[in-house]
Swiss-Prot record:
Residues 1-42, 78-146 are annotated as: Disordered. The gene is EGY1. It comes from Oryza sativa subsp. japonica. This is Probable zinc metalloprotease EGY1, chloroplastic. Residues 16-42, 104-115, 125-137 have a biased composition (Low complexity). The lineage of its organism: Eukaryota, Viridiplantae, Streptophyta, Embryophyta, Tracheophyta. Its EC number is 3.4.24.-.
């Protein structure tokens, strides 16, 4: 085994560098011209590459460097002999060619025998011994892809990933920023770390020398003067910091990313097409919800024809369906109006802060009419207050309109003058929400609620669906409105803990009842990722914003928790059947 490794090392195989494999090329000297690599070297290199050999960095690189001089001397000596033979005319040239061919054949046979001996030794022992490689001073060779081994293919793959990945920060710009931006009066730099999802940026870690908002504004202005609009500077919490800043609050660091990497891309044509298709599907699902709520008023001729298997004769006139569909449209209009008002709230809050939003992508649902909409940020948020305000504006607007419809609908339901506009719904539906069930019970009374069906106004259905959809979107998870608000108020760590709790409650069916599974799948597929950090990701949102969020989450839980049977029976909400 040692003899085989020594034979392989003594041959003009390859010279390993950090980026590629190449033949050794001796430096030119004025005394003698540098010969080209001999055919023996090329033959051995191709034979070694064909074997698919890989070198272990720990034991192989040092040995290869020690063999470098030996390989170079071997190549120079072989070339010098050929050059000396060339002085004898044509016979000398023929002798040189024959000598090179013989040397190539001998070297190839020598390396081939060494490799075959290594393979047979591997078959007997199962693997190459690293100790024998170390003792002989030659690199250990393995056909297995060990964790610390590398090859030309691996290096090319890394380079390819770097080319396909996001563009990194220029080292020259980093040097200029360190020299001209940071100092003992602003931010004393101690070390640097990678920043960003793929390490495409630079995180400057050090000690702050003043008020963070003032220093951050000063650094942003100096960065624009130095590099223009090439980069974005982020102020984030220092990772793995020990304690808080002496001036109060968390210790901060500054992250640097290219503008085209850190900023969201514009809305594409395909996104507009997808948004239009989803909106049409949402309109259809809202109409279907209205039809389902008015199913009790379907013409009896149509009901008999489609439900009686013994029915004969021509089908009923479909013109009878037109009044039925028209009576179902108010529910559809109400659900769509609530969701559109929700999105208008987001845009009204984003406009004065100069934050761009994407076109909303509505999510259809046949139970509630819609699951809401996905609205993306199309510009970097300046601070956490902006994230909180924009995220909370939509749910507040939608909840205000939904509760108004729900309350007015309950009042109209208890008015005998409008009995012709009421629809019959199963009283079991009021057990789906603790908060809304109690409000309905307090408004309609025990006699109306303690029955198999309850006559309610269509506005109650629209308001109920709107409040439920708003409550789902206010859950503190991912990039939902509630998740964004929680991330702005308490940070990503709190969002991770609340998100895990929310997923658990949805999986157990504690929140949302039968809608917990489809809603949980929707969030996992489309909304699970937290929002990207703001430029100033350290600023405090204030006490009243946190208090408003806590109250909102409490109301969300009351809205999504169903009424359990014992409480529903005691309150008279529906008829509870005991088996």
């Amino acid at each position: 085994m040692a003899a085989a490794a020594a034979a392989l090392a003594s041959s003009p195989m390859v010279h390993l560098t950090a980026s590629r494999l190449r033949l050794p090329r001796p430096a030119r000297s004025p005394a003698a011209a540098t010969p080209s690599p001999s055919p023996a070297s090329a033959a051995c290199c191709s034979r070694g590459a064909a074997c698919g050999l890989e070198w272990r960095p720990k034991s192989g690189l040092r040995a290869l460097r020690r063999c470098e001089d030996r390989l170079r001397c071997f190549s120079i000596d072989g070339g010098g002999g050929g050059g000396g033979g060339g002085g004898g005319g044509t016979g000398g040239e023929d002798g040189e060619k024959r000598g090179e061919e013989e040397a190539a054949a001998a070297a190839e046979a020598k390396v081939g025998g060494a490799v075959e001996e290594m393979r047979s030794e591997r078959t007997r022992s199962g693997s190459f011994s690293s100790s024998s490689s170390s003792s002989s001073g030659t690199p250990g060779i393995s056909n297995e892809p060990p964790f610390l081994s590398f090859s030309v293919d691996n290096i090319d793959t890394v380079k390819l990933l770097e080319l396909l990945g996001p563009e990194k920060v220029d080292s020259a710009d980093v040097k200029a920023i360190k020299e001209k931006l940071f100092g003992y009066t602003t931010f004393w730099l101690t070390r640097e770390e990678p920043f960003g999802d793929l390490g495409e940026g630079v995180l400057f870690i050090g000690n702050l020398r003043g008020k963070r908002e003032e220093i951050f504004a000063k650094l942003q202005q100096q960065l624009r003067e130095l590099t223009g609009d090439k980069y974005n500077l982020f102020m984030v919490e220092e990772p793995n910091s020990e304690g808080e800043d002496p001036r109060g609050g968390p210790r901060v660091s500054f992250g640097l990313l290219r503008r085209e990497v850190s900023e969201p891309g514009p809305t594409t044509l395909w996104q507009y097409v997808i948004s239009l298709l989803l909106f049409l599907l949402t309109v259809f699902s809202c109409v279907e919800l209205g039809i389902a709520s008015k199913i009790s008023s379907l013409p009896p001729e149509i009901v008999t024809y489609f439900t009686d298997p013994n029915a004969t004769g021509p089908p009923p006139d479909m013109q009878l369906l037109l009044p039925f569909v028209e009576s179902a449209l108010p529910v559809a209009y109400g659900v769509l109006a609530i969701q559109l008002f929700h999105e208008v709230g987001h845009f009204l809050a984003a406009f004065p802060k100069k934050v761009k939003l994407s076109i909303p992508f509505f999510i259809p649902n046949f139970t509630l009419g819609t699951f809401g909409a996905i609205t993306q940020f199309k510009s970097i948020l300046p601070d956490k207050k902006t994230m909180f305000d924009i995220s909370m504006a939509g749910p507040l607007a939608g909840a205000a309109l939904s509760f108004s419809m729900f309350s007015v609908g309950l009042l109209l339901s208890s008015n005998p003058a409008g009995a012709s506009d009421l629809v019959e719904v199963p009283s079991k539906l009021f057990q789906g929400s603790l908060l809304l069930g109690l409000v309905s019970r307090a408004t309609l009374g025990y006699r109306a609620m303690h029955a198999a069906t309850v006559a309610i106004h269509p506005l109650v259905i629209a308001g109920w669906c709107g409040l439920t959809t708003t409550a789902f979107n206010m859950l503190p998870v991912g990039c939902l409105d509630g998740g964004r608000a929680l991330q702005g108020a308490f940070g990503k760590d709190a969002l991770f803990g609340f998100g895990l709790t929310t997923y658990s409650l949805l999986g157990l069916g504690v929140l949302g009842g039968p809608l917990s599974l489809p809603w949980g799948l929707y969030v996992l597929i489309c909304q699970r990722t937290p929002e990207k950090p703001c430029l100033n990701d350290v600023s405090d949102v204030g006490t009243w914003r946190r208090a408003a969020l806590i109250v909102s989450v409490f109301l969300v839980v009351l809205t999504l928790i169903p009424l359990w049977d014992e409480l529903a029976e005691d309150l008279g909400v529906g008829l509870v059947t005991s088996f």
